[in-house]
Amino acid sequence: MLTLLSVGAAGSALAQTAPAAWLTPSVSLSETLTTNANRIGQQAGESDAITRGTVGFNLRSRAGRAQGALDYAFSGLAYARHAELNTTQQTLNANLALEWWEKQGFLQATAQIGQAAVSAFGAQPNSAGLPSANSTEVRTMSLAPLWRGLLIGDLQLAASGQVGLSDAQGGTQGDSTTRQLSLQVSPRSTGPLGWSVQASRQSGDFRAGAATASSRLYGSLSRAIDDLDLRLSANTGYERGNQASTQQGSAGTWGLGLTWTPTPRTSADMKYDQRLFGASHAVSLQHRTPLTIWRLSSSRALNESGSSLGAAGAGSLYDLYFSQFASVEPDPSRRADLVNAFLAQNGLAGNANAGTGFLRSAATIENRQDFSVAWRGIRNTASLSYGRSQSQRANPSLVATDDLTASPSVNTETWSFTASHRLTPSLSASATVSLQSGNGVGLGQSSRQRTFSTQIGGPLGPKASWSVVLRRALFETALAPYGESAAIASVTMRF
């Protein structure tokens, strides 16, 4: 327990003494020895040595009304035997919370760049980021402004919007633009009984498919039962749109909700809505202890984005430990630094537990269930995650090019287990086992990918670190199965 307390104390002290904004450049060099460089089938697999050089920077800001982080890296990959595979890659993870008008105007912005799978039935991207025939670079961005102001008497008006962009390199599949605009009137003062009236407009436009749009007007009532730490809600209204058919349709909508927060560490949120595209629900259960975090969720919702990059799911290791460290550091910005330091100290990848996905060319109905748990001890950590999803075309009669072209539904499943142990204060070892599968009804729409990896590494002085990874991957499919063994050595320096 002393080590955990020292990690928290050191992280909090570092966060409190850090400047309002700072920039940390970095460079890294890695060498990968692989038995299957192009990952296009066991018969065609050839060994190779792949050199990756990366330059990047980390920007943090806690300057007053602007709170945010930006992590960017640019990599060049050189193949010793397959020069035609030489390429470049980018990674970006950025978020910004801006208060542009004191206590009234706010902006939430996010941006991501990363490798994503084109098909759920092909080889899924791995943590090493090596390209394959089924991966492409995807860029996503979201801007969500909000303004709140006094309307008349005790009534307030909230106007919000959201614009989301998804762009996949090398084609139009996965390229989409989503827009949402909402106006809400509600009482300024809160009490046991609450109400609101809201009008919204949302749309999705796919470059390789059709555009959809809907308008909705509804009213909501909520009732807080403080003795039970419970809040009940209900809504009813009207919706019109073309998300589920080629023609405009309309229907009445209604929904029920329940939020239960018996302790600061335990929460349950349940919602059910009957919408124009059908039934939707969102269930989320979470409980954390001083050393563990438990999550269970289920949802059925309309998805008008072309990419799954950054989508909610079982949660990455970073997401899990970010929630678990809430009692150690309540401030989100400082907690992010603490979690990153914890992951680095234990040799863990923050983006682990990534699920199976594919690029979409039309609006889909996503039905998914996720479970995850993470534990941290004095020198050990362990995490387990499971996720499954079923994707269907929101409009079954729509013709678009993606995995749903030849199958009415795409089913994916992901298991992942990671454990780590700190051998010494400057040496950590970890191991990960994962299973990913994708299934449809079309020819060749079935695959299973198993990955086993171990890692050892640690710091090289105050500003450098090293790691060695051994990986074994097995990809099973009727069309192009393959196996790969790889060893990866890397060195990173921060300035």
Language-model region placement:
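Gram-negative bacterial Sec-dependent N-terminal signal peptides
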Residues: 1-15
